[in-house]
């Protein structure tokens, strides 16, 4: 049984000891570019290797031609999955990245809707067409956009939906899951806390209680 609905967004370092204490309370870890710029690739790898989490996701929001994106991900082999933007299109870009990841048993998430206020939905149909053509493992839909989560869950019933923007960006814990997301991505509310483990446990309890009320179960059947 999966342990949690929470993916820890790591944009700044936490000690290995703290991460080991939290591993049983997490689904996964999302590695942000600021963390890798601070530590470097080798130290980031050393920090994460040995952690018992379901998924390590590198979130550089890749947005380039296929050759460049492949050159980036091949240097980050410690990760299970990678996040890329959808708007860059398929041919010569996401198609090449997806083939490379498939060949190396890695997963792809595509950004569908970002969590910030300025994100435009004018190109939503185009984004959805790209997602359908690429068929990634999952999609990223901002946790502050609950109506969009519900819409994307309806349109992409079997895909994993991960939702950032919970806590510090204004999303309420548990709301994204109730709207249709599988996991909520939470960073600053945990890693900036005086006791990250206590903060994580508190958040997990809030999510569990809310999801039990809205869905009657902690995890959905796929």
UniProtKB/Swiss-Prot annotation:
Its EC number is 4.1.1.23. GO terms for molecular function: orotidine-5'-phosphate decarboxylase activity. Disulfide bonds: none annotated. It comes from the Archaea. It is an enzyme of class 4 (lyase). Keywords: Decarboxylase, Lyase, Pyrimidine biosynthesis. This is Orotidine 5'-phosphate decarboxylase. InterPro entries: Aldolase_TIM, OMPdecase, OMPdecase_arc, OMPdeCOase_dom, RibuloseP-bd_barrel. Substrate binds at residues 11, 30, 59-68, 115, 164-174, 187-188. Belongs to the OMP decarboxylase family. Type 1 subfamily. Homodimer. GO terms for biological process: 'de novo' pyrimidine nucleobase biosynthetic process; 'de novo' UMP biosynthetic process. GO terms for cellular component: cytosol. The keyword Lyase applies. Catalyzes the decarboxylation of orotidine 5'-monophosphate (OMP) to uridine 5'-monophosphate (UMP). The active site is at residue 61. Pathway: Pyrimidine metabolism; UMP biosynthesis via de novo pathway; UMP from orotate: step 2/2. CDD domains: OMP_decarboxylase_like. It catalyses: orotidine 5'-phosphate + H(+) = UMP + CO2. The keyword DNA repair does not apply.
């Amino acid at each position: 049984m999966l342990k949690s609905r929470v993916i820890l967004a790591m944009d700044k370092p936490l000690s290995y000891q703290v991460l080991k204490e939290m591993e049983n309370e997490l689904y996964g870890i999302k590695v942000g570019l600021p963390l890798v710029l601070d530590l470097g690739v080798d130290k980031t790898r050393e920090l994460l290797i040995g952690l018992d989490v379901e998924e390590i996701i590198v979130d550089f929001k890749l947005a380039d031609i296929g050759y460049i994106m492949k050159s980036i991900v091949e240097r980050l082999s410690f990760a299970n999955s990678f996040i890329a933007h959808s708007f860059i299109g398929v041919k010569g870009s996401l198609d090449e990245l997806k083939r490379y990841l498939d060949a190396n048993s890695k997963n792809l998430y595509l950004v569908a809707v970002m969590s910030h206020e300025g994100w435009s939905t004018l190109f939503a149909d185009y984004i959805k067409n790209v997602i359908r053509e690429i068929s990634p493992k999952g999609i990223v839909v901002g946790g502050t956009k609950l109506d969009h989560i519900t819409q994307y869950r309806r349109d992409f019933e079997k895909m994993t939906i991960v939702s950032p923007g919970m806590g510090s960006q204004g999303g309420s814990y548990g709301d994204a899951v109730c709207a249709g997301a599988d996991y909520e991505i939470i960073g600053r509310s945990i890693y900036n806390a005086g006791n990250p483990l206590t903060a994580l446990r508190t958040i997990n309890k809030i999510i569990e209680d809310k999801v039990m009320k809205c869905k009657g179960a902690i995890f959905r059947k796929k």
